[in-house]
Amino acid sequence: VPIAPEPPVVRKGHVTFGTANNPYKFTTACIDTWAVVLRAVPDSRFVFLRPEAGAQGFIANARRVFEQRDVDPARIEFIGVRGAHLPHYNEMDIALDSLPHVGGTTTCEALWMGVPTVTLVGPGFPERLSYSNLTNAGLPELAVHSVEDYVATAAALAADRARLRQLRRELRSMLRSNPLGQVERFVRHFYAKAAEVAGA
């Protein structure tokens, strides 16, 4: 799937955050945190890239919960597609991972499409998969350990248009040159770490 040559902020004039994660991961803490990010970047938008995003009930609920958190519901956008969704990542500048249960496949998809993902790392496996993906893609700095750092990292990335443009152009090649995109290398590292833990 082709990546757009520039992130959408270049043509739209505002940063678009977004998610393609499963709605069951949209906890109260998750929505709270996303709302803080949107308030920290006042001209930004947030897009839901999900099959459910075409349903009027989903749209109404999403707008309501953000409005309750002092975010103008007009800033919330929806792309309701099933199946051929990868091209629509071209409408997203930065993916905001769900929390505490993070993405896995969706994080890889976003990175493949040149969209950096900010994630919050927790103690359990469901809270660390994106951390593994980002670290093995060469972007460990986007995996943070507090909500405050999550917001600060997202806001700083939104303000750095040069980096957004660079990542849009280079992320796919970064994946190919890092363990996440090199199966044999990843497996070697994984088994070496497993052996280290088993011998500890």
Q: What is each residue range found by the language model?
A:
Residues 1-83:
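Conserved catalytic-core segment of nucleotide-activated headgroup transferases in glycan assembly
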Residues 1-12, 158, 162, 192, ...:
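Extracellular/periplasmic ectodomains of large secreted or surface enzymes and adhesion receptors
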Residues 30-34, 150, 190:
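A structural motif in glycosyltransferase catalytic domains
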Residues 84-88:
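Conserved beta-propeller blade repeats
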Residues 89-90, 94, 98-183:
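Catalytic binding pocket for nucleotide-activated donors in carbohydrate/polymer assembly enzymes
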Residues 182-200:
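C-terminal alpha-helical cap of glycosyltransferases
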